[in-house]
């Protein structure tokens, strides 16, 4: 799922979805939904209630070496403030259970909004593939009901060195919501 910042970033022909007031994923028609799920990627219209600019601004504060958020401790290998020179990557990544402890209130609210979007996507996928609703909790590790694991990551990839950037990888979640602001995503 990605915000349609610019149609040239991922391709002009990706399906587009929006969220209904009841947090249901809506496509123009069933053919577009089928195509989105076959591709495994689609644009999502940014809900008006989502403060994307505030989140981007917060993400920029992580680039300041004096940012207090650079002192967030690591919880294992995947959480906390992490700066990886070999990947030209600076990030603050936290699971839902740590958001209130480390993120400012407006970023916690942003994370909860993204989490609701992720749940909507998960429910749509589970429904689309024919998994009975009574099995959704088990099939999604609880995520379809708002449980399970959710990360809110602020990641900056430094492109000032001219290096190719991040090595090939896969994300560790079932639903990844990206805010793509510059070309470079390879799917």
Please tell me what each predicted stretch does.
Residues 1-187:
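Peripheral, non-catalytic segments flanking oxidoreductase cores
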């Amino acid at each position: 799922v990605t915000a349609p910042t610019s149609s040239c970033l991922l391709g002009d022909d990706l399906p587009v979805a929006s969220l209904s007031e009841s947090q249901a994923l809506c496509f123009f028609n069933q053919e577009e939904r089928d195509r989105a799920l076959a591709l495994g990627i689609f644009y999502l219209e940014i809900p008006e209630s989502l403060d994307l600019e505030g989140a981007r601004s917060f993400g920029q504060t992580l680039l300041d070496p004096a940012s207090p958020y650079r002192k967030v401790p690591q919880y294992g290998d995947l959480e906390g403030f992490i700066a990886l020179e070999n990947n030209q990557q600076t990030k603050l990544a936290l699971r839902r259970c740590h958001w209130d402890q480390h993120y400012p209130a407006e970023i916690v609210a942003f994370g909860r909004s993204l989490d609701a979007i992720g749940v909507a996507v998960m429910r749509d996928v589970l429904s689309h593939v024919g998994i009975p609703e009574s099995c959704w909790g088990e099939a999604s590790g609880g995520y379809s009901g708002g449980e399970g694991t959710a990360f809110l990551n602020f990641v900056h990839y430094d492109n000032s060195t001219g290096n190719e950037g991040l090595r090939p990888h896969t994300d560790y979640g079932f639903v990844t919501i990206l805010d793509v602001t510059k070309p470079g995503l390879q799917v």
